[in-house]
Swiss-Prot record:
Cofactor comment text: In vitro glycosyltransferase activity is metal-independent.
Protein source organism: Streptococcus parasanguinis
Pathway assigned in UniProt: Protein modification; protein glycosylation
Biological processes per GO annotation: protein glycosylation
Protein name: Glucosyltransferase 3
Record-level Gene Ontology MF annotations: nucleotide binding; UDP-glucosyltransferase activity
The protein's Enzyme Commission number: 2.4.1.-
Substrate protein-binding loop as annotated region, ranges: 106-111
Family of the protein in this entry: Belongs to the Gtf3 glucosyltransferase family.
Length: 330
């Protein structure tokens, strides 16, 4: 038995979707798993025959009895994911579907794809999902895979050093201001440091910082402040279902976080004292203004006691091994 994992390539260097799949694959390779590389492209440039041959090339190394961890979506359209699943099902193998995002739930305009999405999910032997709430939601739409694993949180494997963190009354937020409208509406006297490529007009107290390589970003953030995990109101329901990659990044940097009430990881954050759960931005601003040095240092201590499991990839190691056990064992 050999274990394989799909992995997308060819997207922008800034693509969080690609970064997440690449990170999981790096951990998987360290465990002895093998990569099935998938290039991101416009699939309709292929004829049916060409696409079938492309998929044959992806799965060419498989043997009967192997296990494949299928990271989904591939972002090559739902049609591509369906066809890849169908190709995998031709083999006498076990299939673990690792759901990063559910496209019909992310974007209301894509909800029409839900039935097709659930149909190919149901061909898996095991489903790994970001949260139990996501699993429950998918069951409401007809998912019937009995074996499931909860991811819980994104790791952020790194060896970047952490500087001593002092109380800085500032908030860090990597993200596109065009996607997160609250950035362009920031009217508070606490500065918001936005890490982005985009050149857009921003409020006076929003400080645009150009793209940073990962280790540089973590080291800069490690010097203090708070990491903000936030979405616009229209996306709050989805935030209660999925795992935010930003959360793992902030914690790996060694700084406390501020997150919206209802986030999928809320219990983990509360139980480990990793930051604050707030109802709105105004409450977040009030807390940043009122926190004292001792309280901040205690939060940092909690985060840095917790973050070795993220920096060494243990959430990912756990789901990769647990899902294989579930696939093989009844």
């Amino acid at each position: 038995m050999r274990v394989y994992i799909t992995n997308i390539n060819g997207q922008s260097i800034q693509s969080t979707a690609q970064l997440c799949q690449n990170t999981v694959t790096d951990v998987a390779v360290s465990l002895g798993y093998r990569e099935l590389g998938i290039y991101c492209y416009q699939i309709h440039t292929d004829s049916e025959s060409e696409l079938s041959k492309r998929l044959d090339g992806i799965v060419a190394g498989l043997r009967h009895g192997d296990v494949v961890i299928f990271q989904t979506p591939t972002w090559n359209t739902t049609e591509f994911d369906e066809k890849l699943m169908n190709k995998l099902k031709l083999y006498d193998i076990k299939i673990v579907l690792f759901i990063h995002d559910v496209v019909p739930l992310m974007f209301s305009g894509n909800f029409y794809l839900m039935d097709r999405t659930i149909a190919y999910y149901n061909k898996a032997d095991v489903v790994v999902a970001p949260s139990q709430k996501m699993i429950d939601k998918l069951r409401d739409f007809g998912m019937n895979v009995s074996k499931t694993v909860v991811q819980g949180m994104w790791d952020h494997p790194t060896q970047a050093p952490m500087f001593p963190a002092g109380l800085k009354r500032e908030i860090h937020f990597p993200g596109n201001p065009e996607r997160f409208s609250f950035v362009k509406e920031w009217k508070y006297d606490i500065p918001l440091k936005v890490y982005t490529w985009q050149n857009v007009e921003l409020p006076q107290n929003v400080h645009k910082i150009n793209y940073r390589p990962d280790e540089q970003l973590l080291m800069e953030m490690s010097q203090g402040g708070f990491g903000l995990v936030w979405m616009d109101d229209k996306d709050k329901e989805y935030q209660s279902l999925y795992c935010s990659y930003k959360l793992g990044s902030f914690l790996a940097a060694g700084i406390p976080v501020i997150v919206q009430e209802g986030i999928a990881n809320q219990e983990l954050i509360e139980n480990n004292g990793l930051g604050w759960i707030v109802k709105d931005v105004e409450e977040a601003i009030m807390k940043v203004k009122n926190v004292n040095e001792d309280e901040y240092i205690e939060l940092v201590k909690n985060v840095r006691s917790f973050n070795p499991i993220l920096r060494k990839g243990f959430f990912t190691r756990r789901l990769l091994t647990e899902s294989v056990f579930q696939a093989i064992c009844d």
